[in-house]
C-alpha cells in the first residue's frame, strides 16, 4: 500500500456464496453498490493490507455478492470471511469546501466562539434532518458535562472546520 495514511474502511467480506469463491459483501457506503465504485480494494488479512480486484458483483436476493481475483474456491472464500474492505484515502472523492468525511471530524477539538474547549468529537450520529457531533467533554469540564450533542449545521452552529488544526469552532453554549 503506497499511502502513509490509514486505509478508509468501507465494508467487510461476509460468508462464502456457492462453490466458486464468491463472497457476500457488507458495505458501509451510502448506497449498497457504492463500494464497487472503488478499485482496487484493500483487504486486511492476518493483520496486513493487500490489494484485490473485484472481477464481478451482483445482487443475490437482498444480499450483494462479489467474485475477487485469485479467490476461486469456497475454502479460500471462507478464509476471507470477516476481513475488512478498505481503500486508500487518495481513492476517496474530493468533497466541496463545506462538506467533510466523518472520519476527518472524529478526534477534532471543539471550541466555542468564546474560546471554551468543549472537548473532542467522539462520534457522529445521523438523525435524518442533520448530523450531530457527539463531543466527549474534557475531564475537568467547568460545566460538569460528560458529553455534548451539537447539531452539525453550518453557519448556524458550526462556524469553522479547520482539518489542518483538527479544530471545529461552534456557536454553542457550553452549558447545553
UniProtKB/Swiss-Prot annotation:
GO terms for biological process: ribosomal small subunit biogenesis; rRNA processing. It holds the Pfam family PRC_RimM. GO terms for cellular component: cytoplasm; ribosome. It is found in: Cytoplasm. SUPFAM superfamilies: PRC-barrel domain, Translation proteins. GO terms for molecular function: ribosome binding. Residues 97-176 form the PRC barrel domain. PANTHER family: RIBOSOME MATURATION FACTOR RIMM. An accessory protein needed during the final step in the assembly of 30S ribosomal subunit, possibly for assembly of the head region. Essential for efficient processing of 16S rRNA. May be needed both before and after RbfA during the maturation of 16S rRNA. It has affinity for free ribosomal 30S subunits but not for 70S ribosomes. Binds ribosomal protein uS19. This is Ribosome maturation factor RimM. The gene is rimM.
Amino acid at each position: 500500500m503506497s499511502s502513509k495514511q490509514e486505509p478508509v474502511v468501507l465494508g467487510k467480506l461476509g460468508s462464502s456464496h456457492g462453490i466458486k469463491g464468491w463472497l457476500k459483501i457488507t458495505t458501509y457506503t451510502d448506497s449498497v453498490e457504492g463500494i464497487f465504485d472503488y478499485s482496487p480494494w484493500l483487504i486486511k488479512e492476518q493483520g496486513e493490507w493487500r490489494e484485490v480486484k473485484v472481477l464481478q458483483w451482483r445482487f443475490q436476493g437482498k444480499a450483494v455478492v462479489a467474485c475477487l481475483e485469485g479467490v476461486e474456491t469456497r475454502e479460500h472464500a471462507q478464509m476471507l470471511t470477516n476481513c475488512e474492505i478498505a481503500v486508500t484515502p487518495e481513492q476517496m472523492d474530493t468533497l466541496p469546501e463545506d462538506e467533510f468525511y466523518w472520519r476527518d471530524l472524529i478526534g477534532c477539538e471543539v471550541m466555542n466562539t468564546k474560546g471554551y474547549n468543549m472537548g473532542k468529537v467522539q462520534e457522529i450520529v445521523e438523525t435524518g434532518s442533520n448530523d450531530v457531533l457527539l463531543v466527549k467533554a474534557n475531564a475537568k469540564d467547568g460545566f460538569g458535562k460528560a458529553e455534548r450533542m451539537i447539531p452539525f449545521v453550518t453557519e448556524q452552529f458550526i462556524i469553522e472546520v479547520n482539518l489542518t488544526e483538527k479544530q471545529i469552532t461552534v456557536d454553542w453554549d457550553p452549558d447545553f
